[in-house]
C-alpha cells in the first residue's frame, strides 16, 4: 500500500492541477474514520469549494473523473465513491494492500526508516539535579526523551542526547549540609536536624561512604572522599559525584543513554555566564534597580521584567539557562528540543526572552519544548507518595523493581505528555489483556509461536516467505492487518513532526488488536501449502513491525511468554 499510496498521491496532484490550474493545495489523503468507508479519503473538493465558489460535491465528481484518467488510479484503485458533502472514498485493489508484506520482509529493521537527511537534532532530557535519586517524573521524562530520540533517528536525523546537570545551585549546598549533619550523627526527627535538609536514606549512604574514604566515578573522573567531617568542599564534591553515579546506574537500568553530560558549573568556570550577561548589557536589554541587574524581558513577551543578578552578586537560576541555550545555538543543531516537567512552564518565556535579547540570531519560538505532567503511583489501590530510599517521593528504581523496565517505559509513554498519568503497579503486573504492554508483547510472542509451529510441523522455511503468493491473502482480517502495517512509516513521520511518541504506543495497541482478531478468525496452519505460506509471510511481517515499533519505545519483544 505504501508504493500505491505514493503513486496515487502523485496522481492526485496531477488531477488537482488539471482541475484547478495554479492551485497551491497540496495533494493529501486521510484515513477514513470507519474501515467500511474504504482505504483512503480525499477532502480536497471541500477545501477548494469556498475559494472557487463552487459546489463541493460537483467539484468532487470532477476530481473523481480527473483522477480516474491517471494511470496510477487505474492500476491501484478498485472504486471511487462520493460521500456526504464532498468526500471521496477510495477502495484499493488487493495488490495495493498486499505489497506492504513484501516491503517489510525486504526492509526488515529498515521498514519505516528514512535515509539520512543531513540534519542534526539535540534533545535535552531528564536533566535532574544531582541531589537525590531519580523520581518517577524523571522516569517519564527519560521514557519520552529516549523515544523522541529514537523516532527522529527513524526519520534520518543525526540525534544528540544531552543531560544538563544543575550542579551549581543552592540545592547543592543543601545536599552538602545534609550529608554533614549525618556525618555528625544527626538524623531526621532530631531537634537539631535542619528543616530544609534532605531526609532520604541515601544521605546516610553518602555519609557512610564518605567516612570510609570511598572513591566514586562520574564523567570518567574519580572523586575520593577526605573522610573529614568539617571538609565541606570534599563533602559537596563527593556527594554530587556519588549521586551522579547513582543516577547513571538508574538510567542504565532503564536502558537510557546520553551522548553528553553538560555541567552548569562549567558555564561559570568557562566564563559563559558572564559572556551572556555582557551580550545582554551591550545590547541595552538590561537595567539596574534596587541594587540588582534586570532583564527587559517584557520587550519579548514575558509578563514582567526579570532579575538577573541579585543585590548580593549572585545570579538567578535562569541566567545560566540563557548561557546554556546560547551555547546550544552556537553548536549548530538544526533543531533543539527540551523535555521538562510542566512546572518549568514559567521559565520558557524568560529563557526565550534572554535568547532574543542577546542578539545572537536565535529565531523566535526556539527551542521546542515538550512539557509533561506529573505521575501518580498507585499500589494495592492506594496512592504511594514516599520511598524509604528517597524519603519524600517514589523513585524510578522503585517502579522498575516493583514491575519491570518494559512496563515502566511503555506505561510512561502510553499517554500524551501534557496529561497527568496514574501508574497502576498492580495493572503493570497483570498477565492479561488489561495490561497494555503485556497485550502488545503477547501479540509478538503469539506470532513467533505460530511461526515456530510452521517450521516444526510443516517443515516450513521462513527464509523463503518473501516468495509467497501474496495474492492469496484475501480475508477481511488480512486486509485490515495489512492496512495497519502500511500505516507504520507515516505514523513515525507524524510522531516526529508532532513530538508525539505516544503515537507509537497507540499504534502498537492497534496493531496487536488487529493481529489478535486475525488469530481468532483464521486457522493459520490448516489447508493448502501456498495459502499457508502467504499467511506465514503476513505473520512474519507483523512480527517485524511489532519489533520495530517496540524498539522505538525501548521495549523488548519476547518470543515466548
Curated annotation (Swiss-Prot):
EC numbers listed for it are 6.1.1.19
User: Which molecular function terms from Gene Ontology are attached?
Assistant: arginine-tRNA ligase activity; ATP binding
Q: Reaction catalysed by this chain?
A: tRNA(Arg) + L-arginine + ATP = L-arginyl-tRNA(Arg) + AMP + diphosphate
Q: Which UniProt keywords apply?
A: Aminoacyl-tRNA synthetase, ATP-binding, Cytoplasm, Ligase, Nucleotide-binding, Protein biosynthesis
Q: Where in the cell is it found?
A: Cytoplasm
One Pfam family this chain carries?
tRNA-synt_1d
Q: Name one GO biological process term.
A: arginyl-tRNA aminoacylation
Q: Return the motif ranges for 'HIGH' region.
A: 128-138
What the entry lists under InterPro entries is as follows: aa-tRNA-synth_I_CS (IPR001412), Arg-tRNA-ligase (IPR001278), Arg-tRNA-synth_N (IPR005148), Arg-tRNA-synth_N_sf (IPR036695), ArgRS_core (IPR035684), DALR_anticod-bd (IPR008909), Rossmann-like_a/b/a_fold (IPR014729), tRNAsynth_Ia_anticodon-bd (IPR009080)
The record's annotation in PROSITE patterns points to: AA_TRNA_LIGASE_I
**A cellular component term (GO) from this record?**
cytoplasm
Q: Does the keyword Nucleus apply?
A: no
The record ties this protein, via Gene3D superfamilies, to:
Arginyl tRNA synthetase N-terminal domain, HUPs, Isoleucyl-tRNA Synthetase, Domain 1
Q: Which PANTHER family match?
A: ARGININE--TRNA LIGASE, CYTOPLASMIC, ARGINYL-TRNA SYNTHETASE
Q: Which NCBIfam families match?
A: argS
By sequence similarity, the record places it as follows: Belongs to the class-I aminoacyl-tRNA synthetase family.
Q: Which HAMAP family match?
A: Arg_tRNA_synth
Q: How does it assemble?
A: Monomer.
Name of the featured protein? Arginine--tRNA ligase
Q: Which organism is it from?
A: Leptothrix cholodnii (strain ATCC 51168 / LMG 8142 / SP-6)
Taxonomy-wise, where does this protein's organism fall, top ranks first?
Bacteria, Pseudomonadati, Pseudomonadota, Betaproteobacteria, Burkholderiales
Amino acid at each position: 500500500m505504501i508504493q500505491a499510496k505514493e503513486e496515487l498521491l502523485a496522481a492526485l496532484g496531477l488531477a488537482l492541477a488539471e482541475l484547478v490550474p495554479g492551485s497551491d493545495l497540496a495533494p493529501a489523503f486521510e484515513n477514513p474514520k470507519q474501515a467500511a468507508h474504504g482505504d483512503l479519503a480525499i477532502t480536497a473538493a471541500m477545501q477548494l469549494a469556498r475559494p472557487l465558489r463552487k459546489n463541493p460535491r460537483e467539484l468532487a465528481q470532477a476530481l473523481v473523473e480527473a483522477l480516474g484518467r491517471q494511470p496510477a488510479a487505474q492500476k491501484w484503485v478498485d472504486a471511487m465513491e462520493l460521500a456526504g458533502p464532498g468526500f471521496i472514498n477510495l477502495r484499493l485493489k488487493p495488490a495495493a494492500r498486499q505489497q506492504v508484506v513484501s516491503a517489510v520482509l525486504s526492509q526488515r529493521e529498515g521498514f519505516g526508516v528514512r535515509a539520512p537527511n543531513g540534519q542534526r537534532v539535540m534533545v535535552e532530557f531528564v536533566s535532574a539535579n544531582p541531589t537525590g535519586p531519580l523520581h518517577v517524573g524523571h522516569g517519564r521524562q527519560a521514557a519520552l526523551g529516549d523515544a523522541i530520540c529514537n523516532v527522529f533517528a527513524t526519520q534520518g536525523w543525526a540525534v544528540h542526547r544531552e543531560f544538563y546537570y544543575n550542579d551549581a545551585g543552592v540545592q547543592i549546598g543543601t545536599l552538602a549540609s545534609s550529608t554533614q549533619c549525618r556525618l555528625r550523627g544527626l538524623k531526621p526527627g532530631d531537634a537539631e536536624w535542619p528543616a530544609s535538609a534532605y531526609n532520604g536514606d541515601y544521605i546516610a549512604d553518602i555519609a557512610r561512604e564518605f567516612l570510609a574514604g570511598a572513591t566514586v566515578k562520574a564523567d570518567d573522573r574519580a572523586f575520593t572522599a577526605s573522610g573529614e567531617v568539617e571538609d565541606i568542599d570534599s563533602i559537596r564534591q563527593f556527594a554530587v559525584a556519588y549521586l551522579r553515579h547513582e543516577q547513571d546506574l538508574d538510567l542504565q537500568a532503564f536502558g537510557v543513554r546520553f551522548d553528553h553530560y553538560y555541567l552548569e558549573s562549567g558555564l561559570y568556570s568557562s566564563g559563559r555566564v558572564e559572556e551572556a550577561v555582557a551580550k545582554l548589557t551591550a545590547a541595552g536589554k538590561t537595567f539596574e534597580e534596587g541594587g540588582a541587574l534586570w532583564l527587559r524581558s517584557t520587550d519579548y513577551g514575558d509578563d514582567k521584567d526579570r532579575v538577573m543578578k541579585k543585590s548580593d552578586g549572585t545570579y538567578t537560576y535562569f541566567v545560566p539557562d540563557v548561557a546554556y541555550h546560547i551555547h546550544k545555538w552556537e553548536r549548530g543543531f538544526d533543531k533543539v528540543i527540551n523535555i521538562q516537567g510542566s512546572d518549568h512552564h514559567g521559565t520558557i518565556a524568560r529563557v526565550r526572552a534572554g535568547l532574543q535579547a542577546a542578539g545572537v540570531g536565535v529565531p523566535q519560538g526556539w527551542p521546542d519544548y515538550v512539557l509533561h505532567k506529573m505521575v501518580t503511583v498507585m499500589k494495592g489501590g492506594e496512592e504511594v507518595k514516599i520511598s524509604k530510599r528517597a524519603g519524600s517521593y517514589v523513585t524510578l528504581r522503585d517502579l522498575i523493581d516493583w514491575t519491570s523496565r518494559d512496563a515502566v517505559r511503555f506505561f510512561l509513554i502510553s499517554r500524551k505528555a501534557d496529561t497527568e498519568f496514574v501508574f497502576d503497579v498492580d495493572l503493570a503486573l497483570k498477565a492479561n489483556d488489561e495490561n497494555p504492554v503485556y497485550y502488545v508483547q503477547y501479540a509478538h510472542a503469539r506470532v513467533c509461536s505460530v511461526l515456530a509451529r510452521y517450521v516444526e510441523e510443516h517443515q516450513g522455511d521462513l527464509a523463503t516467505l518473501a516468495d509467497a503468493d501474496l495474492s492469496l491473502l484475501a480475508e477481511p482480517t488480512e486486509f485490515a492487518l495489512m492496512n495497519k502495517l502500511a500505516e507504520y512509516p507515516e505514523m513515525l513521520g507524524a510522531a516526529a513532526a508532532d513530538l508525539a511518541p505516544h503515537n507509537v504506543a497507540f499504534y502498537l495497541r492497534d496493531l496487536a488488536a488487529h493481529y489478535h482478531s486475525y488469530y481468532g478468525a483464521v486457522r493459520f496452519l490448516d489447508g493448502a501449502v501456498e495459502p499457508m505460506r502467504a499467511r506465514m509471510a503476513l505473520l512474519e511481517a507483523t512480527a517485524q513491525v511489532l519489533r520495530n515499533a517496540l524498539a522505538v519505545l525501548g521495549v523488548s519483544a519476547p518470543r515466548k511468554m
